[in-house]
Amino acid sequence: MIERGTLTFRDAGPDDAEWIAGLLSDEGYPAGATDIRRRLERYVERECPVRVAEAGGERVGFVACQVIPRFEHNDQVVRVMALVVDPGVRGRGVGGALMAEAEKIADGIDAAFLEVTAGHHRPGARRLFEAAGYDASLTTYLRKRR
């Protein structure tokens, strides 16, 4: 277990692009460093945080959040769009710490709620989110592929 107090968090930057691309590619979401740099720029422009977790100066995971203003209410929602932990440290508390970081982001903007999308093909991720109190029985939107 990596102690939560030993993890530090910082905003992702262009120097993280190749590392993030590698993690995403390993998870079945192929991306190059150039793609990730563009995505990071887009997230910064929209004030959507991407945070990197480090332990002992080494990057161990990241979480990318979208801040979404709701039209039907005068508030915002935070959605976790991506959360990936380095395979070498999985099962040691990093994912939970990254979710806690996402919750701090949501608290910081007084978000109405925090939501996360977790595919059925990622049972470990679903268990992480459910253990953190997320309700897996909700279906909040429908999707049509374009």
Predicted regions and their residues:
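Charged catalytic carboxylate motif
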Residues: 16-19, 97-98, 124
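Conserved GNAT acetyl-CoA-binding A-motif
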Residues: 99, 106-118
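Residue-level recognition of the GNAT/N-acetyltransferase active site
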Residues: 68, 81, 86, 90, ...
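Conserved acetyl-CoA-binding loop-helix of GNAT-fold acetyltransferases
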Residues: 85, 91-104, 127, 131
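Conserved active-site alpha-helix within GNAT-family acetyltransferase domains
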Residues: 96, 120-138, 143-144
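Acetyl-CoA-dependent GNAT
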Residues: 5-7, 11-18, 22-75, 81, ...
